[in-house]
Amino acid sequence: MAKSKNHEYVVVTYLFLALFIALIGYFIYFMVFQSESFINNPYNSLQNLFSEYVVRGDIESADGYTLATTKTDSDGNETRSYPYKDLFAHAVGYTGHGKFGLENQANFLLLRSHSMYANQLLNDIKGEKNPGDTVVTTLNYKLQQTAYDALGSHDGAVIVMEPSTGKILAMVSKPAFDP
């Protein structure tokens, strides 16, 4: 009787140990492999916390054109600027409530800072924000402009893709909007 009772305790102990290990593995999976998707989730209010410490990084085309940048006025107010307006509107997207496009997909990267640790510490001491990382896209300005011009006044969409790699070189949609 004592052996079977002891055996039941051992089985229950191992069962709880296995469940505990599975739970720890589940947490590690989400913390290591899924953290970026949780941070990018538009319902995540911690995104606002990141933006308090980091100036959102730039988005650039493959050929070096700045598609989105953050401008800071003398009062410290930040405004997201899109120099090419509706030319890259659908591809780059916009920030704010309901953001989409690269602004949404690369949110984690844009709000991350890889500046030198000493500079980050110095900025923290001075109460200044660290610069966010720059995201370089596969979009090509000249191809984008050509596709935009080819659509003319017609509504529609044009996507130019490099078939061997899957890189999107141009992505235009009309009617466009001014982000």
Regions found by a protein language model. Name each.
Residues 1-179:
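Periplasmic/cell-envelope proteins involved in peptidoglycan metabolism and beta-lactam response
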